[in-house]
């Protein structure tokens, strides 16, 4: 009863009430976007992030000087915003699905009046999200695990004849490889002609995630589990999956990285963190 009353009080005060440390990491992206927006030399602009963070009233001061995390986060946001805009501009009847969306407002940043953008995350996250970023007909919200298949089948039924892209930002490295494989296979089997956009770290970076300037603040509650070795390794998971392209972090915005720009001199580290595009073949090859 005490725990229930505490939860009710927190909800009444509008406090954040995520049920897992992994869900709470979505605050990092929100915080770094807000901090970046205040800079005169900003890489991205997201005033909504400032607004949400102020309303939440969460103390994020321990992350204030995490230069590498902030620069990496906003480069990643810029990449996926650009990909979303490209899809909306070039595709007929596009549906962009943001998996593990957290409190991100990509729809507000990228909407062109065309297509649909679906936001999906765990129910506790979506309950918080609804207070700040309510959905609409062209921006529906789904509270579910990304590993479930019911929402996939629901989208196919709701949007027949549409082409789907899935954006998985800042989430896969926290998961186990068998779960990621299952997710990618389920998407590949249902959405021919689609695209998968995600970021990944190398196996070495996954093993040493406590060296990450923000992850180490969470102690033992949060760490990376999955690292991607070769860029084409995922092609072996399902015959419909085809590597498209990769983009790296530390060869962009060189003036902002500080000493970390020296990582470009060490290829395994320079390419240790990347953002990828995988395509789903229109015609499924025989297995």
Identify the meaning behind each predicted range:
Residues 1-97, 101-144, 149, 154-156:
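Rossmann-like AdoMet
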Residues 147, 173, 201-206:
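Short "lid" loop at the C-terminus of a central beta-strand within the Rossmann-like core
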Residues 152, 174-186:
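A short, conserved alpha-helix within the catalytic core of class I
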Residues 160-170:
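Short SAM/SAH-binding signature in class I
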Residues 165, 190-203:
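Conserved beta-strand signature within the Rossmann-like core of class I S-adenosyl-L-methionine
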Residues 206-222:
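Short, glycine-/aromatic-enriched active-site segment of Class I SAM-dependent methyltransferases
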Residues 221-248:
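Short alpha-helix
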Residues 252, 256-287:
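Core SAM-dependent methyltransferase catalytic element
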